[in-house]
C-alpha cells in the first residue's frame, strides 16, 4: 500500500455524504486517474458505484456487504476490498475509518 502520492492535484472542495458523516477529497494523478482520501464516522451506509472501486482501509474497522458475497465481512486497517462497477454495497462502520478509494477503469 502506497504511503504517499507525488505530482498530483488535490481538489480542495470536499465530497460530503450522509450528513457529513462520510467525507473525502479527490486526488487526480498525471495520467488522469483518480482516488479519494476520506474519513467515515461510525454508522451504516449504502453506496452505489459507476466504476469499479478498490477500497483500502488505512485505519479503523468496518463491516462490508458486497453484491457478490452472501455475508458481512469485517475489515481493519491494512485490508482492502473490491467493488464491481454499476453495483451497490453496504457498510457498517464500527469506529472512525480512514480510507483510500481507487477508481478502476
Curated annotation (Swiss-Prot):
EC number, UniProt record: 2.4.2.1, 2.4.2.2
Catalytic reactions of this protein: a purine D-ribonucleoside + phosphate = a purine nucleobase + alpha-D-ribose 1-phosphate; adenosine + phosphate = alpha-D-ribose 1-phosphate + adenine; cytidine + phosphate = cytosine + alpha-D-ribose 1-phosphate; guanosine + phosphate = alpha-D-ribose 1-phosphate + guanine
Annotated InterPro entries: Ppnp, RmlC-like_jellyroll, RmlC_Cupin_sf
Alphabetized UniProt keyword annotations: Glycosyltransferase, Transferase
Stored SUPFAM superfamilies: RmlC-like cupins (SSF51182)
GO molecular function: guanosine phosphorylase activity; purine-nucleoside phosphorylase activity; thymidine phosphorylase activity; uridine phosphorylase activity
A GO cellular component annotation in the UniProt record: cytosol
Pfam families found in the cross-reference section: Ppnp (PF06865)
Domain of life: Bacteria
Known role: Catalyzes the phosphorolysis of diverse nucleosides, yielding D-ribose 1-phosphate and the respective free bases. Can use uridine, adenosine, guanosine, cytidine, thymidine, inosine and xanthosine as substrates. Also catalyzes the reverse reactions.
Entry's family note: Belongs to the nucleoside phosphorylase PpnP family.
Family annotation (PANTHER family): PYRIMIDINE/PURINE NUCLEOSIDE PHOSPHORYLASE (PTHR36540), PYRIMIDINE_PURINE NUCLEOSIDE PHOSPHORYLASE (PTHR36540:SF1)
Protein name: Pyrimidine/purine nucleoside phosphorylase
Native organism: Wolinella succinogenes (strain ATCC 29543 / DSM 1740 / CCUG 13145 / JCM 31913 / LMG 7466 / NCTC 11488 / FDC 602W)
Gene: ppnP
Amino acid at each position: 500500500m502506497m504511503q504517499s502520492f507525488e505530482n498530483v492535484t488535490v481538489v480542495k472542495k470536499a465530497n460530503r455524504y450522509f450528513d457529513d458523516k462520510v467525507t473525502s477529497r479527490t486526488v487526480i494523478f498525471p495520467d488522469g486517474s483518480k482516488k479519494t482520501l476520506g474519513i467515515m464516522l461510525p454508522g451504516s451506509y449504502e453506496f452505489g458505484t459507476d466504476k469499479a472501486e478498490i477500497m483500502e482501509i488505512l485505519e479503523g474497522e468496518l463491516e462490508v456487504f458486497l453484491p457478490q458475497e452472501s455475508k458481512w465481512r469485517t475489515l481493519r486497517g491494512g485490508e482492502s476490498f473490491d467493488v464491481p462497477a454499476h453495483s451497490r454495497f453496504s457498510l457498517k462502520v464500527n469506529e472512525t475509518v480512514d480510507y483510500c478509494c481507487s477508481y478502476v477503469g
